[in-house]
Amino acid sequence: MKDSSRLSARGLGVTLAGRTVLRDLDLELGPGDAVAVVGPSGAGKSALLRALVGLEPAIAGSLRFGGLELVGAPTEAWRPLRRAVQLCWQDPLSALNPYLSVAELIDEPRVIHGLPRWRVGSPELHASLARVALEPSIERRRPGTLSGGQRQRVALARALAAEPSLLLADEVTSALDRPVAWALIDLLRGLRGDGLGLLLVTHDLSLLPGTIDQVVVLGGGEVVERGPARELLAAPQHPVSRALRAAVPRLPYS
């Protein structure tokens, strides 16, 4: 299971509108792993996530899932990855169809991937809501009527409905107040304990202790530092890493 669900990038590069936004990146993620990609705005974090799920064409290097090379592969070759690797966006409102109910949003990926339906009122749907700390009573509501924290949890429930082995989370706490953000991080920690692989993209190092094992620091579209979370947060070496660390003066690693 671990080998068949492993995502591996080697020398990955991405160019957008003639500008190289990511170069020579190596990354490994499998079930149960917890990796953070951190860096300032414009470092290439979101471009990386989009490339990993085929939304940005990688123009250099290798991207393999379950041992299958995907760079240059036809669209059909991406199908196994697009169920097994799910992405939660920074702004859930832009990713959730405003005309669908919560129940329909969560059921939609199951329809797409040919899984048994989770309909309104079903025990499976209610269990999926409970998993992300949402009440069954919201199942008929639409995204525009929910709070930011509720929308982010619905987006997470929707991603989990595809029964993925890996979850990519793009700045999922950036628009939330701190108590709601920490509640969401606690949910991600619990999912990792269930065997889900987690790739967390963030600029906020305060989210990493107790959540992440390995950290990759991006600056200017390339990896400037990487290492175990405890060691890197305690003694960052690169100026980009030190600047991110200085923005969070109180961490358990010092």
Spans of model-derived segments:
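Helix-to-loop junction immediately C-terminal to a conserved catalytic motif
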Residues: 53
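Conserved ABC ATPase signature
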Residues: 142-146, 150
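ABC ATPase NBD coupling module
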Residues: 70-86, 112, 193, 232-236
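Conserved ABC ATPase "signature" region
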Residues: 120-137, 245-246
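Conserved ABC transporter NBD signature motif
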Residues: 61-70
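ABC ATPase "signature
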Residues: 226-227
